[in-house]
Amino acid sequence: MLPFLLATLGTTALNNSNPKDYCYSARIRSTVLQGLPFGGVPTVLALDFMCFLALLFLFSILRKVAWDYGRLALVTDADRLRRQERDRVEQEYVASAMHGDSHDRYERLTSVSSSVDFDQRDNGFCSWLTAIFRIKDDEIRDKCGGDAVHYLSFQRHIIGLLVVVGVLSVGIVLPVNFSGDLLENNAYSFGRTTIANLKSGNNLLWLHTSFAFLYLLLTVYSMRRHTSKMRYKEDDLVKRTLFINGISKYAESEKIKKHFEEAYPNCTVLEARPCYNVARLMFLDAERKKAERGKLYFTNLQSKENVPTMINPKPCGHLCCCVVRGCEQVEAIEYYTKLEQKLKEDYKREKEKVNEKPLGMAFVTFHNETITAIILKDFNVCKCQGCTCRGEPRPSSCSESLHISNWTVSYAPDPQNIYWEHLSIRGFIWWLRCLVINVVLFILLFFLTTPAIIITTMDKFNVTKPVEYLNNPIITQFFPTLLLWCFSALLPTIVYYSAFFEAHWTRSGENRTTMHKCYTFLIFMVLLLPSLGLSSLDLFFRWLFDKKFLAEAAIRFECVFLPDNGAFFVNYVIASAFIGNAMDLLRIPGLLMYMIRLCLARSAAERRNVKRHQAYEFQFGAAYAWMMCVFTVVMTYSITCPIIVPFGLMYMLLKHLVDRYNLYYAYLPAKLDKKIHSGAVNQVVAAPILCLFWLLFFSTMRTGFLAPTSMFTFVVLVITIVICLCHVCFGHFKYLSAHNYKIEHTETDTVDPRSNGRPPTAAAVPKSAKYIAQVLQDSEVDGDGDGAPGSSGDEPPSSSSQDEELLMPPDALTDTDFQSCEDSLIENEIHQ
């Protein structure tokens, strides 16, 4: 089908003498492609750079004035980690009976303590600029986790790749394009820099095809080099734990242990944790602690000032300046005391019901990786036999009651990677929810794919008529590319919330879904449809299913290679480099949510709670997708319009610096699996493949499908696609793959480890490394005699990190100067 289509396109293309009028009319009226001086690039570059400087100045001001945005939550989190580490070190020290030297442990404690987000090296007006360069990768690893280091390493390899591509494109391909004489001999013509300046029979076109294949090889080599240095660490606990779905809902942990130990004689089950529906329990626990913090806050305030505080308990109550019926003020301590008591009762009732809400899932931890792999292979082999010779897993006396024939067994994700509150959403409900959300998302993006649909709608009301004939680069290039950037910046936020409401079980799954959906929509929005002169997906489908498809297709594909078409994408990359990265520093979506939550707070105590809990994890999925969209645009046009590559390199350099700052200062660490990073590598490889597609279409339009350059490009493209499909679907051609990971195992919870010369203790395992929801771990030490469901009861008591925060006085959270700034801010809030 593809060769027939290309051959038809080549035949009809030769008969279409001048498709420019059609392509221009398909654009934003007649104001986007008009043969401006060098495509309007100098004007757009100057405007975007001035906007960039203005946004940096605004960020520096906001950083000094609203310094608590994105910082108090990080300080609170660092302080919580520091207290948790200190308690763990003390428990280990006592339990080990003074065995060995504790230097290494206290060195880790110092590392955590030193990662407070506000330090003395960036407390000036613009000193944060130099602080970005002084942050080391080891500091980022300690504070932000290994995923942040992998992400930044990925960016550095992309930068290196763009440096090589830029040298080849600007140093060789650009002079070759200049050597043509097909277009007018004008020094200010942007078209002279493009491949459209070469005649169809020029032998220099072989150079472009060869360079496209070379870029593909360079991309694969760069990604293999990145993945070979990635050294992805997998915790030993994760490799020894299986996640079982489809288990009998009322199966007990002892019965699960008995099954595996009977079925596998050499197997020792260390722990079996059934899963329960804890979504409402987690909600009540969070609300209870908020109320307790509010009561503690106003109790401390009254002890200082000896004056009771009155509050309006309605949302936005602190903004209401008039007392009307239904919005009367109440005494703060009394209100929060009643609210806390009510929530405590609801919490206890819900906790008693948790045992009655099993999910039919369990996490089972074994004594070593070998037996874990054997059990996993046993279940998966049986499942893969189909209806012909389906076998049963190894039986035991408990097989029938546990329904082992219905089990789905896989490796468990990291405990920090799990959304415990989402485990209860599954089966038909989850799929229906996912379908509805994605249908709504598709309908929304169906009509708002590009800014062209907005401007063409404005044209119907003659809004742009007065400026249509000005032929000004500000009108024709700056605003369309700015609009395109605004929509492409809004799309990741929309896609992220769609993935969030899908209720994925793991953070990695949520990020992967966001990355793939966002990348697909962005490529359609930013690259494919604007390149083809299509203003939205509705026109795309009308064109695709029209009876005159083949006749119109040639004209559509000619739109890709108009002389000034590349200028639109050059200007888009410039806007992304300067305005996009500056807006990433400001974090406008997060700032808006922060302001809304502050406005909805009912008192100063709740505003303080908002400030302490408004920092979020870095969204690797959306970040990868947006970055790969710009990279794909750059690589796709790197040969047909080589002037775009230096601006793509500028974008990646600024993006790298901005992300280093945000990861270290503005976001909480995230724990993901390697699939999110491998998915980004696959998207990188897609970029040079699209470049080959572009060259194939150009050669087919100019010389026909049977021309030598067209046939060579087609063969290379087919071989590349076949290799990619065989590798992705069947695992072949591993040596030609862009993936070259090396896995390292971290011994976090082995059978007989020794830490610093001391024997291990139960206290050495942090709570986050247990396959049980945090709210159930807290329940183990509530003191009311109720243990967490599925717990063995032999674990030593340890206080909840969040409950510790409640019992600490406000002035004892940390001993840093930054915390004293927080206290003074809160006091100023109180007296306002």
Curated annotation (Swiss-Prot):
Reactions catalysed: Ca(2+)(in) = Ca(2+)(out); Mg(2+)(in) = Mg(2+)(out); K(+)(in) = K(+)(out); Na(+)(in) = Na(+)(out)
Extracellular topological domain residue ranges: 1-40, 179-202, 458-472, 544-566, 639-641, 703-707
GO molecular function list: calcium-activated cation channel activity; mechanosensitive monoatomic cation channel activity; mechanosensitive monoatomic ion channel activity; osmolarity-sensing monoatomic cation channel activity; phosphatidylcholine transfer activity; phospholipid scramblase activity; sphingomyelin transfer activity
Residues lipid-modified (S-palmitoyl cysteine): C51, C126, C382, C398, C726, C729
Protein keywords: Calcium, Cell membrane, Endoplasmic reticulum, Endosome, Exocytosis, Glycoprotein, Hearing, Ion channel, Ion transport, Lipoprotein, Lysosome, Membrane, Palmitate, Phosphoprotein, Transmembrane, Transmembrane helix, Transport
Region (Disordered): 780-814
Keyword set includes Amino-acid biosynthesis: no
Result after altering G580C: Found in patients with neurodevelomental disorder; constitutive phospholipid scramblase activity
Modification after translation, per record: Palmitoylation is required for localization to the plasma membrane and stability.
Residue segments, region Intracellular linker IL2: 231-426
Biased composition (Low complexity): 789-801
PANTHER family: CSC1-LIKE PROTEIN 2 (PTHR13018:SF38), PROBABLE MEMBRANE PROTEIN DUF221-RELATED (PTHR13018)
Recorded family membership: Belongs to the CSC1 (TC 1.A.17) family.
Protein name, per record: Mechanosensitive cation channel TMEM63B
Originating species: Homo sapiens (Human)
Protein's gene: TMEM63B
